[in-house]
Amino acid sequence: MKKIAFLISLAFASAANAGNTTVTLTADNEFWLYSGNAAGTNLVLRGEGHSWPTAFNFSFDVNAGDYLYVAARDQGGPQAWQAAISAPVGALYSNINSWKYIVSPNNNVSQAGVAANVAAGGWANPLAQTDYNASPWGARVNDPNAKWIWHDTLGLANGWNDPSSSDGTYAIFRTNDAVAAIPEPSTYAMMIGGLAMLAALRRRKTAA
């Protein structure tokens, strides 16, 4: 029975740990990448970058029901970020259709600060994007599916000095959907049923 209980716990743990995610990401001017649930109560910092000409690469495991969060901060001039992602649910990219955003009321980019903003909610759809190789940034993640995006304006007007409403603070972008699906109840039922059959066969063999 101890072995069966161990197998059951192992099966549940495997279902909860949904799989590997790889992210190639950059932002003008800097970013912090998190994963966690929709409420932001278990955010994990996965990486950060502070040089927009550089595409940063990250690889990590996500849990079932996890979303990805990009906290991005501009320091003046044009503003945007770009990403190509491989997740358990498939390929994801930076574009205005796959993400939502909120603007922080302060400049606290600590994990606690980001979590507080996520908990406050108020998500909206981002408005601004341009092609992956657009000026002044060029193709940093080298994938034509990855747009340069921002929540209100890319800041390309007025000599690349069009202000954003998040100037002086920062914006948080979250995937529309979880990047690792939560297993259906039937999946757990099938796992338990299969293990129960193994237990019954084991008992029958022992009795024989």
Go through the PLM ranges and name each one.
Residues A199-A208:
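C-terminal membrane-anchoring or membrane-association module
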Residues A5-N20, N176-L195, L201:
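Short, threonine-centered small-residue motifs that mark membrane-proximal processing/anchoring sites
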Residues T26, N63, Y69-A180:
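Accessory carbohydrate-binding/adhesion or oligomerization-edge regions at the termini
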Residues T21-E30:
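Short N-terminal segments immediately surrounding and downstream of signal-peptide cleavage
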Residues I4-A5, A207:
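Residue-level detector of intrinsically disordered/flexible regions characterized by low predicted structural confidence
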Residues E30-A84, A115:
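Beta-strand-rich ligand-recognition modules
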